[in-house]
């Protein structure tokens, strides 16, 4: 009887643990319907599937400009990089917010193929999809992320303290960020193979109609990749 009870308890613990791991690292939650309902919005904000889990964990992405403002070109956070940004939205064009276990931010084609314009100084900026590409903003962003990762303050204690100003993470989520997501993100951002500007990518940015394979698209997104544990 005791043995059966012990086996039952072990099974419950194993199942609960497996379910927690699935929820925290692998559960795929669709993006909001408004993104897929419009081709323009899907291009600007839709997640690109390159066959691997990727992205900067959302709360790290949010904390970095606040923790390292000195590495931005000027005050203003990500907006200072010259990225195309619609005023009513949370993040610039070219960024996709995706929940695969944890919420992460990934890049898509609009990082290089979107621009904004406004009618007059007081006009509301309008983001246009797929014009001639521009990679200057992305180069500035890559430099920013690398400088952050090289800074000794890019550590769990500093980042979680900044995140705590925005949201109170659960104990489990704090442990995941401290021991998994923050170390893996730092390692990924410091890996030179994750920051790739091939001649083909630069040529494509100047001529968006040129052939651009899925493999090269994967390289474009590799700078913000973190592998699933």
Regions found by a protein language model. Give the residues of each.
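N-terminal Sec-pathway targeting helices
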Residues: 1-15, 19-22
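Extracytoplasmic redox metalloprotein regions
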Residues: 72-229
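Extracytoplasmic c-type cytochrome modules immediately beyond a signal peptide or single-pass transmembrane anchor
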Residues: 19-101, 216-228
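Acidic/proline-rich low-complexity IDRs
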Residues: 4-5, 10, 43, 63-66, ...
């Amino acid at each position: 009887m005791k043995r059966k009870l012990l086996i039952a308890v072990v099974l419950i613990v194993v199942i609960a643990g497996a379910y927690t791991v699935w929820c925290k690292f692998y559960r795929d939650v669709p993006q909001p319907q408004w993104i897929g309902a419009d081709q323009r919005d899907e291009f600007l904000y839709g997640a690109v599937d390159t066959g691997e889990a990727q992205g900067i964990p959302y709360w790290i992405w949010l904390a970095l400009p606040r923790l390292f403002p000195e590495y931005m070109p000027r005050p203003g956070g990500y907006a200072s990089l010259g990225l195309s940004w619609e005023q009513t939205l949370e993040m610039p064009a070219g960024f996709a917010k995706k929940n695969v276990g944890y919420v992460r931010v990934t890049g898509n084609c609009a990082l290089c193929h979107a621009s904004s314009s406004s009618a007059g100084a007081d006009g509301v900026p309008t983001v246009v999809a797929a014009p001639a590409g521009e990679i200057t903003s992305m180069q500035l962003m890559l430099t920013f992320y690398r400088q952050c990762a090289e800074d000794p303050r890019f550590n769990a204690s500093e980042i979680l303290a900044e995140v705590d100003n925005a949201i109170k993470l659960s104990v489990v989520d704090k442990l995941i960020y401290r021991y998994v997501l923050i170390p893996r993100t730092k390692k990924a951002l410091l890996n030179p193979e994750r920051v790739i500007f091939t001649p083909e990518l630069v040529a494509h940015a100047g001529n968006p109609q040129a052939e651009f394979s899925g493999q090269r698209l994967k390289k474009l997104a590799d700078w913000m990749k973190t592998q699933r544990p």
